[in-house]
Amino acid sequence: MNADEAIVERWVERTLTSYPAETLPFLSGEQDPFRNPVGHTLRKSLATLAQELLGSMDKNRIAEALDALVRMRAVQSFSPADAVRFVFGLRAVMQETSGTVPESLQSRIDELALMAFDQYMSCREQIFELRVNELRSRMRYAVSGEEETE
């Protein structure tokens, strides 16, 4: 395992601790993306994010990986802080593995956290809008159903 793979693996481990303890063996052990979509998305997204943060910073790849991960955490009803806390976990992992976090990487991590927060809020807004629309639809149906019986 090279240094970048070790960083990703440690970042995945740290991020998995945000899930309930009883799910950790499954999330960390099951590799099948169909049986464990959460673990698969987490591994794939964090690997892409680490590659881009430590490399070229391709905004499109970052946005795609971040969207998959943050959307999943928004649906799982993480609080805003808990949903994006994984981003700051990379800083701790870098400190553990290399003993230092370059200023340029710290800035990239901060930028990623802001992007993650924006994405989380956008996802939560979409969820809220879906719920409101569903309630409106139910109300219309209930009202129209009552009118037909009168």
What is the meaning of each model-derived region?
Residues 1-68, 99-150:
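Core of compact, soluble alpha-helical bundle domains
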Residues 71, 86-87, 109:
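Generic preference for hydrophobic/aromatic residues in regular secondary structure cores
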Residues 78-97:
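Elongated alpha-helical scaffolds
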